[in-house]
Amino acid sequence: MITDNNKKLAQWAMDYALKNGCQAAKLVLYSNSNASFELRDAKMDKLQQASESGLSISLYVDGKYGSYSTNRLDKKELESFIRNGIESTRYLAEDEARVLPDSSRYYKGGKPDLQLFDDKFYNLNPDDKVAIARAAAEEVLGKDERIISVGSSYSDGEEASYRLTSNGFEGESKSTWFSVSADVAVKGEGEARPSSYWYDSAMFYDKLIKSGIGTKALERVLKKLGQRKAASGKYTMIVDPMNAGQLLSPLLSALYGSALQQKSSFLLNKLNTKVGSDKLNLMDEPHLIGARGARYFDNEGVATERRPIFENGTLKTYFIDTYNSKKMGVEPTISSPSLLILQPGNKDLDGLVADVQKGILVTGFNGGNSNKSTGDFSYGIEGFLIENGKLVQPVNEMNVTGNMITLWSSLVAVGNDPRLSSYWRIPSLVFEGVDFSGS
């Protein structure tokens, strides 16, 4: 929690820096706390509670830039911390691209509360939290003789920050989160010990799904029994909403100013170019009330806005912060996306599977990588073989390979099943003609 006294301290620290040799500065005061209760076979295994608060300050001194942080918030100690930071910055190389954003780009306030904080957070009983985790385990224990172990957990936390810049920005944000999970390992064929999990998370305690988590984890792991490789070849690939973000991540990483400026992005010079199918429609929706990831300003204080990332497969924007915009000589956009929503289709996962004659449903990625310069990728996967619209065999120890642009150009369908508790609301995805290596 950020108090009024905390804010006054931050404002004093800003003034002190400007009066002691610093021409410009930005400051972040933060306060975070979290708790987790981890159980093994319904018995307490690990309890963890943590809280931290601190101050980070970026100093612009004689054309040079340095960033420093401390968790010692006594005024006297902050005086020496700031003075030492200013002196240290003077030893650094000049960098004319290190400037604060133009003040006209800052969020000026006046919009409704985004409703990201649950006041109930402070009144929850630890015994109730443990009971939620224990209930998830008890849904599993004794339900199948092949069960080896059952893990379950409950966790929650709060995050708060207060930001200032010397050229006029002031902003505050706070949020809460709650989560419950279960994981189950069972005895499979021979030495096989498949495992799986399930979880739910929410920004408000009353919206957290607290039952059925263990049951779902057990259901998922039992479906893995008898896993083996399928034949190598080209398949229609479906990726479930738990894992679709794995394929979106390399695409987004290629849009950041740092990658573009270093010419290490496979989407360099692709603005307003078609790099995916017409089904690729991705929006940044930062102002959705009560949604994880919603915010009115980014980490520079720049006002967020609704913006298309991809429209019918065409790239519409990059994520270019102030520093990289100066380095590249282009206009800045935003430092990072907030809440990403891929336009959904009209079928759930079962409906998508029913439409596929020969395919693989991917329910997990196991290692691998994507080359950020070329977009070439290779990932280990597990999931299910699809024949004539039905899941006929669990598979594992297979690899999927290709190129990100080629892959997203082969996107033929999108589900209607995104996880609404995520920063990335990405439904199930269907790609045609994807290369798999197996047996």
Regions found by a protein language model. Give the residues of each.
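Dual-mode signal for accessory low-complexity, basic/Gly-rich regions
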Residues: 268-439
